A protein has these predicted regions:
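Binding-site signature for planar aromatic cofactors or substrates
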Residues: 1-242
């Protein structure tokens, strides 16, 4: 869901977003042979996007390590992208990968034949060649710490950034939180009493590391300081609008 400036504008492509999600996801849900198992901290990702999964010897997934007849997928992997900052609807995206497992040393190697990414704007089928060639966003591994620090230590800066948001997007807003950041920009979650929306603040140039990100955010804050101050965020009663 987005309002105000176009959400996800000048952002990562679907393949890069899928690889970023895969790189930082901590848990993996696997559906195979009619069963479903959840694995936590058990997967790594190869450079070409294959998933290496460590499973117990008695796992039912051992049976899924043989390709299905006619090359049909034998398993579906699901990953969730959870916002590190407490907000409503914390699932920012989901990634589904259909394919099959092959045994290799101490791992099962999952080779995807179909990759689907569901974002707030809808679901998209990711091209397999683009998925294999893509790299995670350079800030993906530090995003959680950056966002929680911004929300906890610099709420004044977050509110100042709302000066860059169209006034109609802030109507009846009760809280604004940093939702996501990548090398292209920062996304704010604008919460209202009964709804929420996301607004994208695009950087003037990509940020490939934390130092560059700091500079990009300072530029946004400078722009915000020069902008007209928006109407103060309304503090609604917990029991609803008046």
């Amino acid at each position: 869901m987005g309002d105000g400036q176009a959400a996800w504008a000048a952002g990562p492509c679907a393949a890069e977003q899928a690889r970023s999600l895969l790189a930082v996801a901590w848990s993996c849900r696997v559906t195979a042979d009619g069963g479903r198992e959840e694995f936590v901290g058990a997967h790594t990702v190869a450079d070409d996007g294959r998933v290496l999964l460590r499973v117990p010897e008695d796992s039912a997934l051992a049976a899924a390590a043989v390709p299905a007849p006619r090359g049909e997928p034998s398993a579906v992997l699901e990953f969730a992208d959870v916002a590190p900052v407490p907000v409503r609807s914390r699932i920012r995206a989901r990634l589904w990968m259909a394919g099959w497992f092959l045994p290799a040393d101490e791992h099962l190697v999952f080779r995807p034949t179909r990759v689907v990414l569901r974002r707030p704007s809808g679901a998209v089928v990711v091209d397999l060649d683009e998925f294999a060639a893509a790299h995670p966003d350079p800030l993906a591994g530090v995003e959680a710490g950056l966002l929680t620090h911004l929300a906890d230590a610099h709420p004044d800066a977050v509110e100042r950034l709302t000066r860059l948001v169209e006034p109609e997007s802030l109507h009846a807003a009760t809280r604004v939180q940093p939702l996501a950041v990548d090398r292209h920009g920062l996304t704010l979650r604008i919460e209202r009493t009964r709804a929420q929306g996301d607004v994208r603040l695009t950087f003037h140039a990509p940020a490939d590391d934390v130092a560059e990100l700091t500079e990009r955010v300072h530029v946004l804050l400078a722009r915000a300081a020069a902008a007209a101050c928006p109407r103060t965020l309304q503090r609604q009663r917990a029991d609803g609008d008046r």
